[in-house]
Amino acid sequence: MSIKARLIAMSFLQFFVWGSWLISLGGYMIVTLNFTGVEVGSIFSTMGIASLFMPAIMGIISDRFYNAEKVLGFCHIVGAALLLLASNVTDYPTLYIIMLFNSMFYMPTIALSNTVSYNALEKNGLDIVKSFPPIRVWGTIGFIAAMWIVDILDWTKSPYQLYLSGGSALLLGLYSFTMPKRPPLKSSDAKSFANSVGLDAFVLFKSKKMAIFFVFSMFLGAALQITNLFGGSFLDDFKTLYPGTFGVEHPNLLLSISQISETLFILTIPFFLQKFGIKKVMLFSIIAWVFRFGLFAIGNPGGGLILLILSMIIYGMAFDFFNISGSLFVEREADPKIRASAQGLFMIMTNGLGAFFGG
């Protein structure tokens, strides 16, 4: 099997694990376990808490002590055990603790899988800029595939979604150990904890422009978390008004249009950036988020289904345009000495604080 095919399989499984439960777990907890909205939100906020420090810690471990592919495999195997354990838990306090630890081991794997991919491509003499994006797209395809499987098998309100996620995490954990070796870096090349989590980039808050950008990033991170958290249960609330409709019977299939749109819109970004520039593309994203939630609010699974579908399609623009143009904006505005840290700060504001407040 070629290295690209192996990396595609890894990327597919990486997000298949997440897609198995991220969109549907909220509905399972509210409808089946009878958790309150606050309890569900707090469980989802564990991803934000974990994102504040665990990627940096695991990054340091892989930079200084152990091979990155081994750390990746270890994290997924531990995560698999936690997910399988969570499938048999029905009380809030225990499930919260388990999902907190699961987040602590899953969230770092997103960056670790990128590190393993970059290393494998470099070792095989391939251009990362050209080769990695088509590989990463398979991650989104894996996410969509997991959502469809959970929906078609009618597991959206069942703990079986956690079995699926746990089983695929175990498979990925074992598979990770077969990836090309990425040994620890030399001590002079290893990042410090402060550098890894972006603490030395806080100087950017002195700039009004950057301060506004980072605060807005946090709000968008919160909006994304709300979408992931309550989208399925929001559609489920229509079951008495529109029984038997597509949106009620297959919420994951409907919501997966968002990820399909995301996959397609990412291909248009080079054109929009060249035509309009970073700032205008970011403005398009802000406007798209307004329409995303506006259409979602006034739509319904009955006569308003087209509005829900449009909301899902617009999500692709809202998510991709801000994430990618935002990252490029940080790269352009930050001093070269702290660019890596600035990107870390961008991730903290969106996936860390944003996800926490959104939960």
Regions found by a protein language model. Name each.
Residues 77-91, 288-301:
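C-terminal ends and interior cores of transmembrane alpha-helices
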